[in-house]
C-alpha cells in the first residue's frame, strides 16, 4: 500500500513537470495591444498615436511633422493644433526645433532661419 502511494506521488510530480514544460507560464511576456506612451516632462503620458491634444499641445513627436525638439522648460507647445499652429514655443523661450522642412524656429530671441541658405529671413514681428 505504501509503495502504491509513493508511486502515485512520483507519477503525479512527473506529470506536472511534463505539463508545465509544454504550457505557457504566467510570467510569459506578450506584445502590448495599446500604443506605447511617450514620456513627458509635464503632465501624464500621452499615447504616441494621438496628435496635438492635451493641456499644452503635447510634447511628443507627431507622425506628419517628423520634428524633434529640445527645451529648457518644463512644458512646451509642439502641435499642429491649438493657438500656436505648429510652432514650438516653450515657456522659457529657450528651444530649438528641427523639422524636415527648410525652416528652423529659434525662439530664444531669434527670428526665422532657412536651413538651406543659412541666412536670416525677414521676421514679420520685427519688420521695420
Swiss-Prot record:
**Compositional bias segments (type: Basic and acidic residues):** 115-128
Annotated transmembrane regions: none
Superkingdom is Eukaryota
Q: Which residues form a coiled coil?
A: none
In what ranges is there compositional bias, type Polar residues? 27-36, 87-101
Question: Which region ranges are annotated with the description Disordered?
Answer: 27-48, 86-128
- What does the record give as the function of this protein? General role in the development of germlings including formation of the infection structures.
Protein name as annotated: Infection structure-specific protein 56
| Gene it is expressed from | INF56
Amino acid at each position: 500500500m505504501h509503495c502504491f502511494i509513493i508511486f502515485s506521488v512520483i507519477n503525479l510530480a512527473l506529470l506536472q513537470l511534463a505539463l508545465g514544460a509544454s504550457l505557457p507560464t504566467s510570467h510569459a511576456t506578450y506584445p502590448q495591444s495599446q500604443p506605447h506612451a511617450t514620456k513627458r516632462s509635464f503632465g501624464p503620458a500621452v499615447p504616441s498615436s494621438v496628435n496635438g491634444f492635451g493641456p499644452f499641445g503635447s510634447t511628443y513627436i507627431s507622425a506628419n511633422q517628423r520634428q524633434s525638439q529640445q527645451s529648457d522648460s518644463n512644458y512646451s507647445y509642439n502641435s499642429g493644433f491649438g493657438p500656436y499652429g505648429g510652432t514650438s514655443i516653450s515657456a522659457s523661450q529657450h528651444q530649438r526645433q528641427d523639422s524636415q522642412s527648410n525652416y528652423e524656429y529659434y525662439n530664444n530671441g531669434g527670428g526665422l532661419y532657412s536651413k538651406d541658405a543659412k541666412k536670416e529671413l525677414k521676421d514679420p514681428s520685427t519688420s521695420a
